[in-house]
Amino acid sequence: DFNALTKRYTQAYLEGPQIFKHGTSGVVPVANMLNTFVYKNRTEGQSPDVQTLDGARIVENFDMRGGGMHNCMTGCIVKCSNIVHDADGNYKTSALEFETITLLGANCAIKTIDEVANLDRLCDELGLDTIETGAALGVLMDSGGMEWGDSAAAARVLEEITRGGETGCMIGHGVVETGKRRG
């Protein structure tokens, strides 16, 4: 019977090692060790900022800031999705996952989880995919259009999308368009 099998599986999972208890953001150190935590538009496989981009920083802040782990959808037993609050305890974003930390963070030489969370929130508000946007910002930085690691400038470019600015529209159209325009 399916329900009995599901119950047994759920129980075995919950009693076993919880390798994803911190979500996919918890694999940042492993990816860095394996040279797959892309840095500076994929020109390097390791980030010197791995400690400040590690998803463990998110979990460490739960007690002080609020937030927490939750299930990404009804019925999910893993509960590896996170809710991130800012330093004042206000909701900032949710589901700050490995891919977002990698592309909006290390790929752009952005140094901290808080900076990535700010960019993630802007992407959410603008309806932008964080992976595509991080890749486009990386191309912009790599081509000299913005300083590496300048999260404030990256935020300004994302905000420019709503005003129809040239650079903002280019980033909003994605990495292929950004690559074509930036050569």
Model-derived features: positions:
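Intrinsically disordered, low-complexity segments enriched in small residues
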Residues: D1-G183
